[in-house]
Regions:
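Conserved hydrophobic/aromatic beta-strand scaffold that supports enzyme active sites
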Residues: 8, 36-38, 204-206
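Short, flexible, basic/aromatic active-site loop/helix in glycosyltransferases
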Residues: 11-28
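Short, small-residue-biased leader/transition segments that mark boundaries at the very start
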Residues: 2-5
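A structural signal for short hydrophobic beta-strand segments in well-ordered beta-sheet cores
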Residues: 9-11, 75
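A short glycine-threonine-serine/GTX helix/turn-capping micro-motif
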Residues: 26-36, 79
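Short, well-ordered beta-strand micro-motif
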Residues: 10, 38-40, 84
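Left-handed beta-helix
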Residues: 42, 50-213
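Conserved nucleotide-sugar donor-binding
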Residues: 35-46
């Protein structure tokens, strides 16, 4: 379903894009667009302005596809790990997929991906803590139980708290004796003591940035 909702592209023998097909349901091997583009700033501004005065709003369909004969648009082949994140469900699913064997290696490979750096202490696992099949960034403090979850940097899981099948973003705090399952939190979320939050794999609970529940 994700493939069908993406753009397909047709190329000539020189990898020049000659056609963009939006929401096309063709079967078989196809060239799937990743919707990543490198373009000169002034050219982009000109194209957006021209589309705006005409009431056009979609970049691929209304700007690129309409100007393929005028623009020199080429494709670069990428055979690595690709995930389409378009809503909360797909965001949750793709994070959970990182916990599967081989997914991390497929994503990063031998070449590192450099992101914003915030040097922090290594994650601390205190006495009585339990962590299974999870991916934790640095700066976390774990006193409770974490299973099948992705924790961003600086998360704190207090004593007696149980976290399962969750994606917890930066500096999320789960207080003692909480039980959270199938939950996605934004940054700086505070889950108060003895709280129970339970979603499902098809409809995870989302807690917005900075909220306390």
């Amino acid at each position: 379903s994700d493939v069908c909702s993406s753009d397909l592209i047709r190329l000539d023998d020189n990898d020049r894009v000659v056609e963009i097909l939006s929401n096309d349901y063709r079967i078989g091997e196809q060239n799937l667009a990743m919707n990543i583009y490198v373009i000169e700033r002034e050219s982009l501004i000109h194209l957006i302005h021209d589309a705006s005065v005409r009431g056009l709003v979609y970049f691929e369909r209304d700007i690129l596809a309409r100007n393929l004969k005028l623009l020199n648009v080429h494709a670069y082949r990428f055979d690595g790990y690709v995930a389409r994140v378009s809503d909360m469900k797909s965001y949750f699913d793709e994070n959970m997929r990182l916990l599967q064997e081989g997914s991390m290696d497929a994503l990063f490979g031998p070449a590192p991906i450099y992101t914003k750096i915030r040097d922090d202490n290594p994650t601390r696992y205190l006495e009585g803590s339990s962590v299974k099949n999870s991916l934790l960034a640095d700066g976390c403090v774990i006193e409770g139980s974490v299973e099948n979850s992705v924790l961003f940097r600086g998360c704190k899981i207090k004593k007696g708290a149980v976290v399962k099948n969750c994606v917890l973003m930066q500096d999320t705090v789960v207080e003692p004796n909480c039980n959270v399952e199938y939950v996605v939190t934004d940054k700086n979320v505070h889950i108060t003591e003895d709280k129970k939050l339970t979603g499902t794999d098809t409809f995870p609970v989302f807690v917005a940035k900075g909220h306390s529940v």
